[in-house]
């Protein structure tokens, strides 16, 4: 596609005229549609291969044009400098994604790389780190290089990296012995091993496993922030800030001088710990003696392109006014200083004066710039066919008759084949090999994607996209980084931190106090220290650590500690045991009943089904495809389906359900779609109508929004079989509704229905296929324990290229709120304003009305009548209101694609899972969503709230906040799946133990034996210092992780693997660790030899075999193999168990390892008869 369109364009006279003067003189290029403009700009860049700067009026336009340019130019050569046109951004946690794009761009420019650089106006004006300072902090490390370690680590801190004990997030580094781990903003995490001061090796590593992968010869370490802050910068900042404070103080009202002092003190406080880059970026205008702007980073001969100049000047005016108003308000309220700012206003004008500029505009209009050339292109939009095949046929025939070359761009190879066969059926010849010479009058169908098609008549070229053919949007964008799977999100909530609650299988709920090395009888060992009720403490040897689990329960619940030796824990466990057995019985009975009952068996997919599925405008995610296959598989079996489909909000459950519904209708069955609220019913009804508009399917709605007459007609239609699909609330469960032939019941969020309705659903389940949808994730552990008892399908992957919601955590401030509201309303969007106090919610509306006099503002809360609430919500969905001031009632279920800003007051009072779900309300269309989590200014937060806010900040990446939210949602999901009353039981023993007990109960009822090794746990008691010293592994989490791995070792290969990991992560190990590994090695052989006990008796070592091993051992072989030990070994039999005694010598440990290996080998050889 690239070469073909490029050839056409490069041979055109207008393009050649443009090419001659581009970059030499000021030119105006008019008449090109957005995608045609991107095509011309990309072609010019590819021809010259110089630095090219493309300025747009905002980030949204930059994103749009980037997407089109990426169709032609390799993404390694396309750079964007993404900056929001929003002051609030400077005052909040930065999005790592936007930050990494900015750093990538600045680094490429500083290194003089060629590339096409797309910059929104706001990015162009920002004050930046001086170019020389930036260059000085670009580091390349090579194997064999000598480094000053202290200076190197200091540089990392200047560059915005944070030092941690274990590296798990972008922007962190750690030092352990001679090993430095770094997780750069761009690229993979790296592990640098030093030999004294020389770089001995560089390896990339996996943050999940902490293991190294491949050796690399060199690594580039980019900064972790777009500002470099050195000691000198801090010194300069302190001096300038002091001057600004002293200058501002007398110029503001006396009433706010104290506030100004507090603001000043808060910055000084942070300077002492200095490098909080997030905070100090607000003071960029005081940081550097000579700050740079982006133009300073470009080469002198860079080509400059300006997109829609008049629109940029408009944006510049608005931006200047906004910034000035914002800063004035900040200064007047004592929250800012005179001289504080973020941008150089005149930088854009300076750019235009210093360079020859190519201005692109769609229409010719007067511009206040000198122009030497005007080049007019004639470009027409393409007819929108939207699946109207007659119009499509005649238009394509016209193109062919007029000798046009037609290029049809589609997303995938499969679609190429589909479109080709469709056009061939219309008798329109197509070509698929784009490398052939294409003549006029031919249609080429090829893979590719632009935001829209275009026609260049004088070139006789027309480009048509899927958007014109079928009304689908283009989706090709720069690939985003892989999203973390649910399993990985949840994995690290198991990490134990000091102070965490734990559950000991035998002793109950306690508190984890850390790992402690104790001396017991002259030997040092590590123990897990646990606190119980009162002053009780328990030291658990690390080799028994599998009896200790992290206590996980509903959010913010602190459990009661158990008393050591008390009976309370035994009683609690017995109650839970009874409860899980009851559940297991119920599940097994349901399962058996379903296996025996006979339902309708659907046929294979029809041709209509395939056509219907092809109409879906997006690519399915792998999880969606798998779920659809599982559901169809169930429908094609004789027993009734009862499947639960879980997937996060917006992950595409509805499409899966719609396909199942269509399949049922094609087989002559009726479908009932049951939803918990009237609004959801309306939304699902509209989705079904839109998806099935081209097929003969009769769809009706039963809800309060329907008249009595309409509902009566629907009921008659259901009874007669005229209605195929009915969507509705619990009204569908009424006795007065009769179906002619109901085949499929789809239930959305079953847990939101009352007991009576659930009972009715249960009776329907007996002979109808049922598909239940839920947005609450089901925990994997629970998923595993229910395998074979409950059919579950899980959608864990989000749709490709869904924009991540930009999340800001900010102190509450009227300026921020006003800016956020204005920004959303100016793009004709809507806002959810979350205020969780019903008693003063109307006052809040009045406040916002004063702030935004022209906005229509509605209120929604749980104390309104159901009718009022639904009508308000519906009006909001229909865009009759701009802002909805609401309580958490919007947490589930409402889909308002046009509402893409969420503001939450007092976010510190919400639970993480709540915040996570609320945030899922925005960013659900093709626009970027914004979430502002506000917390009261100057409020002293309690520890939990502070932790929670810290965690919310990490929501901007897939950080631990995400994992905790997932944890809480999973527990909620468990409660929903097993019934609300189980919540209490889960909380009483902790989620993990509960899941384990449930799995054991289900397996026992199904007659599945637990796989347990024949050999019991081997006791090895040797007088050796065998542990992981704190000097070797500082992180307690890492220690526990290694102990867990050693506990699971069953083969020599696994042991070698742990040894490799220790050397890889922590360098060569000391003697205490070597002894620990020796003991594990002895255990491995003892396990396979049937040894029960190895005990140090002081002068000798006693080894006792199990009675079975005593029977199986080949004694003759043992004596033959152990001859080198001579008299040091004695063998006897006591109580049917072989008893081996080894007298200790200097080398007794080696002798013991040898002896245990000999016993194992003697097991494998049978006595000769």
From Swiss-Prot:
Molecular function, one GO term: DNA helicase activity
GO cellular component, one term: cytoplasm
Keywords: ATP-binding, Cytoplasm, DNA damage, DNA repair, DNA-binding, Helicase, Hydrolase, Nucleotide-binding
One Gene Ontology term from the biological process aspect of the record: regulation of DNA-templated transcription
UniProt cross-references to CDD domains, sorted A to Z: DEXHc_TRCF (cd17991)
InterPro entries per the UniProt record, alphabetical: CarD-like/TRCF_RID, CarD-like/TRCF_RID_sf, DEAD/DEAH_box_helicase_dom, Helicase_ATP-bd, Helicase_C-like, Mfd, P-loop_NTPase, RecG/Mfd
Domain of life, per lineage: Bacteria
Ranges for domain Helicase C-terminal: 809-970
Record-annotated Helicase ATP-binding domain positions: 634-795
E.C. no: 3.6.4.-
Alphabetized Gene3D superfamilies for the sequence: 2.40.10.170, 3.40.50.11180, P-loop containing nucleotide triphosphate hydrolases (3.40.50.300), Penicillin-binding protein 1b domain (3.30.2060.10), Transcription-repair-coupling factor, D7 domain (3.90.1150.50)
Annotated residues for binding of ATP: 647-654
SUPFAM superfamilies (UniProt xref): CarD-like, P-loop containing nucleoside triphosphate hydrolases, TRCF domain-like
Record-annotated membrane-spanning stretches: none
Subcellular location: Cytoplasm
Motif (DEEQ box): 748-751
PANTHER family assigned to the protein according to its UniProt record, in alphabetical order: ATP-DEPENDENT DNA HELICASE HOMOLOG RECG, CHLOROPLASTIC
Membership in a protein family: In the N-terminal section; belongs to the UvrB family.
HAMAP family hit by this protein: TRCF (MF_00969)
Function: Couples transcription and DNA repair by recognizing RNA polymerase (RNAP) stalled at DNA lesions. Mediates ATP-dependent release of RNAP and its truncated transcript from the DNA, and recruitment of nucleotide excision repair machinery to the damaged site.
Protein name: Transcription-repair-coupling factor
UniProt organism field: Staphylococcus epidermidis (strain ATCC 12228 / FDA PCI 1200)
Gene name linked to the record: mfd
């Amino acid at each position: 596609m690239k070469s073909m369109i490029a050839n056409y364009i490069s041979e055109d006279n207008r393009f050649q005229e443009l090419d001659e003067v581009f970059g030499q003189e000021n030119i105006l290029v008019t008449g090109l549609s957005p995608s045609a403009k991107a095509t011309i700009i990309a072609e010019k860049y590819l021809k010259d291969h110089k630095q090219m700067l493309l300025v747009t009026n905002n980030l949204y336009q930059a994103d749009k044009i980037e997407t089109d340019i990426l169709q032609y130019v390799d993404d390694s050569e396309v750079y964007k400098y993404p900056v929001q046109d929003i002051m609030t951004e400077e005052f909040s946690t930065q999005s790592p994604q936007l930050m990494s794009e900015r750093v990538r761009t600045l680094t490429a420019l500083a290194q003089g790389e060629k590339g096409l650089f797309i910059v929104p106006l706001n990015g162009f004006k920002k004050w930046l780190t001086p170019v020389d300072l930036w260059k000085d902090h670009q580091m390349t490390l090579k194997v064999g290089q000598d480094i000053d370690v202290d200076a190197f680590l200091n540089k990392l801190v200047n560059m915005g990296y944070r030092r941690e004990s274990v590296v798990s997030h972008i922007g962190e580094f750690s030092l352990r012995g001679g090993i430095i781990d770094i997780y750069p903003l761009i690229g993979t995490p790296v592990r640098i091993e030093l030999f004294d001061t020389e770089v001995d090796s560089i390896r990339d590593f996996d943050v999940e496993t902490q293991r190294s992968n491949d050796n690399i010869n060199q690594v580039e370490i980019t900064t972790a922030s777009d500002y470099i802050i050195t000691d000198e910068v801090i010194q300069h900042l302190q001096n300038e800030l002091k001057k600004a404070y002293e200058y501002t103080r007398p110029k503001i009202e006396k009433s706010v001088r104290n506030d100004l002092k507090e603001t000043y003190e808060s910055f000084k406080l942070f300077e002492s710990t200095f490098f909080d880059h997030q905070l100090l970026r607000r003071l960029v205008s005081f940081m550097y003696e000579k700050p740079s702007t982006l133009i300073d980073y470009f080469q002198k001969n860079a080509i400059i392109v300006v997109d829609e100049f008049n629109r940029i000047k408009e944006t510049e005016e608005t931006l200047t006014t906004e910034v000035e108003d914002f800063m004035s308000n900040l200064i007047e309220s004592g929250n800012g200083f005179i001289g504080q700012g973020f941008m150089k206003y005149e930088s854009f004008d300076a750019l235009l004066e210093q360079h020859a500029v190519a201005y692109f505009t769609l229409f010719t209009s007067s511009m206040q710039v000198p122009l030497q050339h005007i080049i007019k292109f004639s470009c027409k939009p393409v007819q929108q066919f939207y699946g109207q095949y007659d119009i499509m046929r005649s238009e394509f025939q016209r193109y062919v008759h007029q000798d046009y070359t037609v290029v049809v761009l589609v997303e995938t190879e499969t679609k190429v084949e589909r479109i080709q066969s469709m056009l061939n059926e219309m008798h329109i010849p197509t070509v698929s090999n784009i490398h052939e010479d294409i003549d006029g009058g031919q249609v080429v169908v090829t893979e590719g994607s632009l935001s829209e098609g275009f026609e260049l008549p004088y070139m006789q070229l027309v480009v048509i996209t899927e958007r014109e053919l079928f009304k689908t949007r283009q989706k090709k964008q720069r690939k985003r980084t892989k999203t973390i799977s649910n399993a990985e999100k949840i994995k690290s909530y198991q990490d134990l931190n000091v102070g965490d609650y734990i559950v000991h299988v035998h002793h109950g709920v306690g508190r984890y106090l850390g790992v402690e090395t104790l001396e017991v009888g002259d030997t040092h060992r590590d123990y897990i220290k646990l606190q119980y009720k009162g002053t009780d403490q328990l030291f658990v040897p690390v080799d028994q650590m599998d009896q200790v689990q992290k206590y996980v329960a509903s959010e913010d619940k602190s459990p009661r500690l158990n008393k050591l030796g008390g009976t309370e824990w035994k009683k609690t466990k017995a109650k839970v045991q009874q409860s899980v057995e009851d559940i297991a019985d119920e599940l097994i009975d349901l399962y058996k009943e379903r296996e025996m009952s006979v339902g309708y068996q659907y046929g294979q997919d029809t041709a209509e089904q395939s056509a219907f599925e092809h109409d879906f405008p997006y690519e399915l995610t792998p999880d969606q495809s798998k779920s659809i296959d599982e559901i169809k598989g169930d429908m094609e079996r004789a027993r009734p389906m009862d499947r639960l489909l879980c997937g996060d909000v917006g992950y595409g459950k509805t499409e899966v359900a719609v396909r199942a519904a269509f399949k049922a209708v094609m087989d002559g069955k009726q479908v009932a779609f049951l939803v918990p609220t009237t609004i959801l019913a309306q939304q699902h009804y509209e989705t079904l109508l839109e998806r099935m508009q081209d097929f003969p399917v009769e769809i009706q709605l039963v809800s309060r929004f329907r008249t009595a007459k309409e509902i009566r007609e629907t009921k008659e239609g259901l009874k007669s079989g005229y209605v195929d699909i009915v969507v509705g609330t619990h009204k569908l469960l009424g006795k007065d509704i009769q179906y002619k032939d109901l085949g499929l019941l789809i239930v959305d969020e079953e847990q939101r229905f009352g007991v009576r309705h659930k009972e009715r659903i249960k009776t329907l389940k007996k002979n109808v296929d049922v598909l239940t949808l839920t947005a609450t994730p089901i925990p994997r552990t629970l998923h595993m324990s229910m395998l074979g008892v409950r059919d579950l399908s899980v959608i864990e992957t989000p749709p490709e290229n869904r924009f991540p919601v930009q999340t800001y955590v900010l102190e509450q401030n009227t300026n921020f709120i006003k800016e956020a509201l204005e920004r959303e309303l100016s793009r004709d969007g809507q806002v959810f304003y979350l205020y969780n106090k019903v008693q003063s919610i109307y006052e809040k509306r009045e406040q916002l009305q004063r702030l935004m006099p022209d906005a229509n503002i509605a209120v929604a809360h749980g104390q309104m009548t159901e009718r009022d609430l639904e009508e308000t919500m519906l009006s909001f969905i229909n865009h009759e209101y701009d802002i909805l001031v609401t309580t958490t009632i919007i947490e589930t279920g409402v889909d308002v694609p046009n509402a893409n800003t969420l503001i939450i007051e007092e976010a510190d009072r919400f639970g993480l899972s709540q915040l996570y779900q609320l945030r899922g309300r925005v960013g659900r269309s093709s626009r970027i969503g914004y979430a502002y989590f506000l917390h009261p200014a100057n409020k002293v937060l309690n520890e939990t709230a502070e932790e929670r806010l810290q965690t919310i900040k990490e929501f901007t990446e897939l950080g631990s906040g995400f994992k905790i939210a997932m944890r809480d949602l999973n527990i909620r999901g468990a409660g929903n799946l097993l019934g609300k009353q189980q919540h209490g039981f889960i909380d009483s023993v902790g989620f993990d133990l509960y899941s384990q007990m449930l799995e054991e109960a289900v397996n026992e009822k199904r007659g599945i034996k637990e796989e347990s090794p024949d050999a019991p746990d081997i006791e090895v008691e040797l007088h050796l210092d065998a542990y992981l010293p704190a000097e070797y592994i500082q992180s307690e989490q890492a220690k526990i992780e290694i102990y867990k791995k050693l506990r699971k070792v069953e083969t020599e290969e696994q042991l070698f693997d742990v040894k490799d990991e220790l050397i890889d992560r922590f360098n060569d190990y000391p003697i205490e660790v070597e002894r620990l590994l020796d003991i594990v090695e002895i255990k491995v052989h003892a396990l396979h030899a049937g040894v029960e006990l190895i005990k140090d008796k002081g002068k000798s070592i006693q080894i006792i075999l199990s009675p079975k091993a005593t029977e199986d051992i080949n004694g003759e072989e043992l004596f033959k193999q152990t001859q080198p030990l001579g008299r040091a070994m004695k063998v006897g039999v006591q109580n049917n168990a072989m008893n081996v005694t080894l007298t200790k010598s200097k080398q007794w440990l080696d002798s013991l390892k040898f002896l245990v290996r000999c016993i194992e080998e003697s097991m494998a050889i049978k006595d000769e008869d």
